[in-house]
């Protein structure tokens, strides 16, 4: 049996505690070796639960020879610096989305990973859930005719006042935290370059951080995409594809629980069919894929899942940046 990929973690984020590190400790392909924080108490808390070492400071973790790859759940505003340092230290990287806050930083890091022959992945977990490939197969087989319109939404209730996602200096805001999901889904189904026709957002009065937004995109073929996202909503995570002869609807699209049995609803000529799929743990699948690709010598331009490549990450960053520029022109 091959040795597991040895993982070091930069930062003690809630999502790492709840979802990613339990999966990394559970699958045979990875071993969590150490967790680094600038707060020793946080590092010790993580280390106690996940039976690994606590490290004070991110650089000290990167200097360790017993770590093959790092997982980066830091705030987005810190990603460019520490992903870059991890790659310079010859570590493979799995980073939470967004990879960085600018298209130029994303392109720079992808270029660095290419030169160092290292794996760099942006952690869009939903891409690892098989139902989205089923939906794309249905679309490409003509089940709903020609695609006319794509709609995707992701909204969550308000966060605690102290949540770092309300801090603009750390790359906070609804667009970079959850708006990126509908944008990535639009790219998954519409394919090719997307143009931002318009965007608007609602911002917090004091901090200026964006709390919600709407986006209108268009593909080269003329198909439009409507995206909605925000921190001030009843929970909703869904998308639909509206074609010339029918419609496909997917609920709990981006963050389904591992035990969730996905249902794809297909509407055609007044008839509704529901396609039930087995439950999948997209977190475990993402972790396993990352480790597998490291062992296989997969590079940044060899996708683990459709579209998950260096060039795709650059395209995603450029689209999100364009949305951000457009929303600032139309924000309230």
Curated annotation (Swiss-Prot):
Transmembrane segments: none annotated. The active site is at residue 97. Substrate binds at residues 19, 235, 255. SUPFAM superfamilies: Glyceraldehyde-3-phosphate dehydrogenase-like, C-terminal domain, NAD(P)-binding Rossmann-fold domains. It catalyses: dTDP-4-dehydro-2,6-dideoxy-alpha-D-glucose + NADP(+) = dTDP-3,4-didehydro-2,6-dideoxy-alpha-D-glucose + NADPH + H(+). Pfam families: GFO_IDH_MocA, GFO_IDH_MocA_C3. It is an enzyme of class 1 (oxidoreductase). Its EC number is 1.1.1.384. InterPro entries: Gfo/Idh/MocA-like_OxRdtase_N (IPR000683), Gfo/Idh/MocA_domain (IPR050984), GFO_IDH_MocA-like_dom (IPR055170), NAD(P)-bd_dom_sf (IPR036291). Keywords: NADP, Oxidoreductase. NADP(+) binds at residues 12-18, 37-38, 58, 74, 79, 165, 177. One of its GO terms (molecular function) is nucleotide binding. Disruption phenotype: Cells lacking this gene accumulate the pseudoaglycone (PSA) containing tri-O-methyl rhamnose, but lacking the dimethylamino sugar forosamine. The keyword ATP-binding does not apply. Gene3D superfamilies: Dihydrodipicolinate Reductase, domain 2, NAD(P)-binding Rossmann-like Domain. PANTHER family: OXIDOREDUCTASES, TRANS-1,2-DIHYDROBENZENE-1,2-DIOL DEHYDROGENASE. Belongs to the Gfo/Idh/MocA family. Involved in the biosynthesis of forosamine ((4-dimethylamino)-2,3,4,6-tetradeoxy-alpha-D-threo-hexopyranose), a highly deoxygenated sugar component of several bioactive natural products such as the insecticidal spinosyns A and D. NADPH is the better reductant, however NADH can also be used. Monomer. This is dTDP-3,4-didehydro-2,6-dideoxy-alpha-D-glucose 3-reductase.
């Amino acid at each position: 049996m091959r040795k597991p990929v040895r993982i070091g973690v930069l930062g003690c984020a809630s999502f790492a505690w709840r979802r990613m590190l339990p999966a990394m400790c559970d699958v045979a392909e990875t071993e969590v070796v150490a967790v680094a924080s600038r707060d020793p108490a946080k590092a010790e808390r993580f280390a106690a639960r996940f039976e690994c070492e606590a490290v004070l400071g991110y650089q000290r973790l990167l200097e360790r020879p017993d770590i093959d790859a790092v997982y980066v759940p830091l705030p987005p505003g810190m990603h460019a610096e520490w992903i870059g340092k991890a790659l310079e230290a010859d570590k493979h990287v799995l980073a939470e989305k967004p990879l960085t806050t600018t298209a130029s930083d994303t392109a720079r890091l992808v270029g660095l990973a290419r030169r160092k022959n290292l794996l760099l992945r942006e952690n869009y977990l939903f891409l690892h859930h098989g139902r989205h490939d089923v939906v794309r197969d249905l679309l490409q087989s003509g089940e709903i005719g020609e695609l006319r319109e794509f709609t995707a939404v992701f909204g969550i209730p308000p966060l605690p006042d102290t949540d770092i996602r309300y801090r603009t200096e750390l790359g906070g805001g609804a667009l970079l935290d959850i708006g990126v999901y509908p944008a990535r889904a639009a790219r998954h189904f519409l394919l090719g370059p997307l143009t931002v026709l318009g965007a608007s957002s609602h911002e917090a009065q004091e901090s200026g951080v964006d709390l919600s937004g709407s986006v209108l995109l268009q593909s080269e073929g003329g198909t439009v995409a409507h995206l909605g996202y925000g921190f001030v909503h009843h929970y909703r995570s869904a998308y639909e594809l509206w074609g010339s002869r029918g419609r496909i609807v997917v609920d709990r699209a981006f963050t389904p629980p591992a035990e969730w049995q996905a249902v794809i609803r297909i509407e055609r000529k007044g008839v509704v069919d529901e396609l039930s799929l087995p439950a999948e743990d997209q977190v475990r699948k993402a972790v396993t894929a990352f480790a597998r690709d490291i062992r296989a010598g997969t590079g940044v331009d060899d996708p683990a899942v459709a579209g998950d490549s260096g060039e795709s990450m650059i395209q995603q960053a450029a689209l999100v940046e364009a949305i951000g520029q457009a929303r600032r022109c139309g924000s309230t």
